[in-house]
Amino acid sequence: MYLIDEGKIIKEYRIALGGSPKGHKVQEGDHKTPEGRYILDYKKEDSAFHRAMHISYPNTADKAKAKELGVDPGGFIMVHGNNPKNKYLQVDWTEGCIAITDDEMDEFMDLVQVGTPIEIMWTESDQHN
C-alpha cells in the first residue's frame, strides 16, 4: 500500500487483504477487499486489531450492485493493525480489510486525516503493497 502526498509516494506498507483478494467485493462474507475510490471517514481507537480507520465502503454504486444481485454488500471495512499477534502479513487473512503491522498503524493514524481519499486496486505484481 502506498501513502501518497502531492503525487509523491511518502510511505510504502506491506499489507494483508481479504482471504480472496482478487476481484471487487460484492457481498458480505466474500472475503474480498473492495476496489475503487472511497474515503477514510473515521478513526477507531478501540479496534480488536489494535487501531483502525474506516473505509467508506459500500458506496452508492456498491449498494446498487448488491441490490441488483439480491445480496447484502457488507461493510465495516477498515485499514487496521495486525492484532492478534498470530496473524501474519505474508498471507491474506482479513475478511476484506487491509491490515498492516501495529507499529505501522500507529504511524498511519498519525499521518492520515479523516476525510482522506483512498483508492484501492488490485495489481498482480504488487499484490501485497
Q: What are these language model-derived features?
A:
Residues 10-39:
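Electropositive
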Residues 37, 42-129:
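Exported/periplasmic cell-wall-interacting domains
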